[in-house]
């Protein structure tokens, strides 16, 4: 069975909040009540939330206006390396105040910096006589990789997986943002390895990937799931009960 962990088992190494022009920063570990980071192979960039219990009115004094950068680093027990990344704050929830104290609770919503860069530029370019996977690499490097001089906050990310596509093609990208351009290219790609056209472009906590769904199915499973009808106990057919379970 896989090891079950409580949220408190996670070691928080860094929660550093920078203001919009990087002229000021503050450590918010002490006021972070909850955080979550979401990975999805059908979503291009990481997303997440931070729940802050603010008893020092940081939202006014810093201030937090929804254009900040958050540096996150945490460590899972038993893992050799920490998980870290820098993200853009794009939304702040309504504030909730307690009845018996002066603290206030609110949520900061964040996304990867590449999502912001994606909104700022367009790709209007022709690629000639090259595989689609190479075109995707060029779009990623030229339009999404952070080239800011604030390298300690925005270390450049990598396209860790770029599954090779078949045949040389000539394709004109018609003025799309980078994520749209990669989707446009993905729809025209066929894998060398499995003759599949199910390419997807996504980010996980390690970096970005351009790969097919068939490649996922060839990987070793992380968990084994057993499924049985929800209203029948196979050990005792006369008993009704939920039998979905996961073995890890």
Residue ranges of model-derived segments:
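Charged- and aromatic-enriched interaction segments used to assemble
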Residues: 101-246
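Assembly/oligomerization scaffold segments
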Residues: 1-122
């Amino acid at each position: 069975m896989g090891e079950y962990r409580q949220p408190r088992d996670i070691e928080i190494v860094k929660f550093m909040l920078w203001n919009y022009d990087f002229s000021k920063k503050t450590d918010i570990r002490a006021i972070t009540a909850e955080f979550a980071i979401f990975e999805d192979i059908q979503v291009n960039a990481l997303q997440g939330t931070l729940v802050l219990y603010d008893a020092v009115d940081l939202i006014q004094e810093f201030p937090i206006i929804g254009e900040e950068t958050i540096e996150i680093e945490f460590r899972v027990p038993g893992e050799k390396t920490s998980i870290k990344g820098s993200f853009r704050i794009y939304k702040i929830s309504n504030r909730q105040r307690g009845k018996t104290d002066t603290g206030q609770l609110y949520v900061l919503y964040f996304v990867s910096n590449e999502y912001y860069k994606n909104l700022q530029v367009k790709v209007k370019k022709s690629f000639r006589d090259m595989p689609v996977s190479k075109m995707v690499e060029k779009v990623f490097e030229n339009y999404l990789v952070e080239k800011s001089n604030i390298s300690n906050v925005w270390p450049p990310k990598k396209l860790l997986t770029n599954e090779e596509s078949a045949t040389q093609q000539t394709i004109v990208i018609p003025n799309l943002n980078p994520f749209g351009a990669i989707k446009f290219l993905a729809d025209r790609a066929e894998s060398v390895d499995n003759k599949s056209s199910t390419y997807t472009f996504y980010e996980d906590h390690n970096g970005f990937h351009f790969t097919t769904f068939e490649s996922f199915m060839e990987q070793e499973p992380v968990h084994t799931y057993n499924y049985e009808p929800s209203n029948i106990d196979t050990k005792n057919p006369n008993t009704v009960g939920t039998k979905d379970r996961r073995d890890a």
